[in-house]
Amino acid sequence: MTTRQATKDPLLRGVSPTPSKIPVRSQKRTPFPTVTSCAVDQENQDPRRWVQKPPLNIQRPLVDSAGPRPKARHQAETSQRLVGISQPRNPLEELRPSPRGQNVGPGPPAQTEAPGTIEFVADPAALATILSGEGVKSCHLGRQPSLAKRVLVRGSQGGTTQRVQGVRASAYLAPRTPTHRLDPARASCFSRLEGPGPRGRTLCPQRLQALISPSGPSFHPSTRPSFQELRRETAGSSRTSVSQASGLLLETPVQPAFSLPKGEREVVTHSDEGGVASLGLAQRVPLRENREMSHTRDSHDSHLMPSPAPVAQPLPGHVVPCPSPFGRAQRVPSPGPPTLTSYSVLRRLTVQPKTRFTPMPSTPRVQQAQWLRGVSPQSCSEDPALPWEQVAVRLFDQESCIRSLEGSGKPPVATPSGPHSNRTPSLQEVKIQRIGILQQLLRQEVEGLVGGQCVPLNGGSSLDMVELQPLLTEISRTLNATEHNSGTSHLPGLLKHSGLPKPCLPEECGEPQPCPPAEPGPPEAFCRSEPEIPEPSLQEQLEVPEPYPPAEPRPLESCCRSEPEIPESSRQEQLEVPEPCPPAEPRPLESYCRIEPEIPESSRQEQLEVPEPCPPAEPGPLQPSTQGQSGPPGPCPRVELGASEPCTLEHRSLESSLPPCCSQWAPATTSLIFSSQHPLCASPPICSLQSLRPPAGQAGLSNLAPRTLALRERLKSCLTAIHCFHEARLDDECAFYTSRAPPSGPTRVCTNPVATLLEWQDALCFIPVGSAAPQGSP
């Protein structure tokens, strides 16, 4: 057909005998330089005629209803242009449909295409897509929609090849709107295209508001470019209103594609008025831009959202009351100057939103929530859902840990409701609650142990505490690793409460102290924050420290780490109590030593400090022992009061605990102090912490009480629950991914060569050799 028309048209004839349309279009352009300026309007309007052609009306009854009036006006306005353009249009019509086999279209539609083709000439990518006919093929609407699509292709393809690719199938359709929904919109677009006159009418700000308000936010952001097109095609006065309207549209939040149909329908309904024709046009542009929006939205969630408010608008609370206020519209940075009318401006709009529009950090979350829920990206409850998701994920960890530890989901209950801002506090609170529960558990167990077993099982209970202490410390570390400040602050209070019995217990028996030390174990972190308290003990200990100042300063450190305040109270109380009951103190020392390598430090410190807090009892022993003075009597009373057995236990504990502490802090101090103090029991060998623990474990095993064992088991179970939970999560992940990889070796591995041979033969017989090879190779 191109050749036939070429004969008719000298321009085409001269350009190319072949049906290639690109050169033809370029030639046509030259004859109609004036047409190029109006090409956009003519394209939009000419397609309108197309639509109104009875043969082409198939899917556009609405368009026809709206079309006649604007068409007449448009004809009147563009009669000159049309007169000049009519000839090239026929060849264009023939040329375009010819590749698609749509040549049937009447001549006038071809004419309408001519101006569009002029636009296309500039866009080789658009021409390629048109020639391939993919855009039309993708849509079932037929040539008329294809024309609209072509226009869209022309406008959109200026942007990028990606856009062109997107155009082929989805460019013309809003990414999420069904094609059938788009048809009314396209019809409205055609009605719009008829003439600038109706557009001028529709561009009145009131009218735009009226149009916008019914569809409300439903208009897709893609409407922005459409308004710019309207601006381009309308009178100057209308342009100002259009710019305002475009601002409003820019302001309007992105709406789900499903909302578009409302706008389209409304446009169709108003297309008779001609006022909505502009909106339909806008939507026609949106069709192109919608696609881009969808792709970009998927790839760059945060960039395309014009502003946080629009994104939030889907949420019930954030719904923008009215897009009408122009001030708001102008607040939103318009990607392109409102006055620009070229498609380049539209492209800019599509591209710039990525850069200019304030990226929505929350949008990715919103879309994640949407994807998770399988809802369209603009589902209303997106933001709330996200917090729930993430909170649930975090809570899952916390809840599993908490439930495994506590068997109660109390802390998680508070967290799920908390917004993102509250998550951090919620985590802290959860940890604090966990710690509190563990402390209560320990307190109950320890109190039971202290009440029934501490006195009889001085060594045993202390050993139990020694073994349990690392567990407690590990738990406290795992739970409080992130929250030494907050967690420890709470712990010290609890420990102080639990520690109070400790000072009281020293009076009753030296062993209760081990129980408090077990709790002081957490204070280690807390004590670290409060080294000052040990300093007073140092001052108190100054008497003792004088002989062993180096040992004590480090013990002070250890005290600070192990028990800042509690040691002070216990030490001060010990000053009172230990003095009366020096043997009790040695036992506490044992208990402390056994309770924790660090607590042994504290115990050692307390031993040092206990002497310090109890300068009368221990300063004597320490200094005298070092000095060889009355120190032995001090320790001796202990030995006597404590009984030789406690002394031996103390030997072990002190040997194990004190030397380790000393080894940690000051080996010299340990040797001095222990050499001075322990000649009574036995010269305690200075042992490393490792050595300390094994003896403690051995002794503890020998002396453990059933309740102590139960407590130990519970503590271990708590720790194991945490580890098991993490491991379980890892296992789940591994299982998930491994299960996802079904590809395994051949389903049938034939060890029998005869069977394999037969299989190969079968494959060759019944299956192409190419496919047989993979089957044959087991």
Swiss-Prot record:
Keywords: Cell adhesion, Cytoplasm, Phosphoprotein, Repeat. The modification Phosphothreonine is found at T363. Transmembrane segments: none annotated. Residues 516-647 are annotated as: 4 X 33 AA approximate tandem repeats. PANTHER family: TASTIN. GO terms for cellular component: cytoplasm. The keyword Phosphoprotein applies. Residues 1-115, 212-244, 406-425, 508-587, 600-641 are annotated as: Disordered. It is found in: Cytoplasm. Sequence repeats lie at residues 516-548, 549-581, 582-614, 615-647. Residues 1-11, 560-574 have a biased composition (Basic and acidic residues). Disulfide bonds: none annotated. One of its GO terms (biological process) is cell adhesion. Directly binds bystin, and indirectly trophinin. Could be involved with bystin and trophinin in a cell adhesion molecule complex that mediates an initial attachment of the blastocyst to uterine epithelial cells at the time of the embryo implantation. This is Tastin.
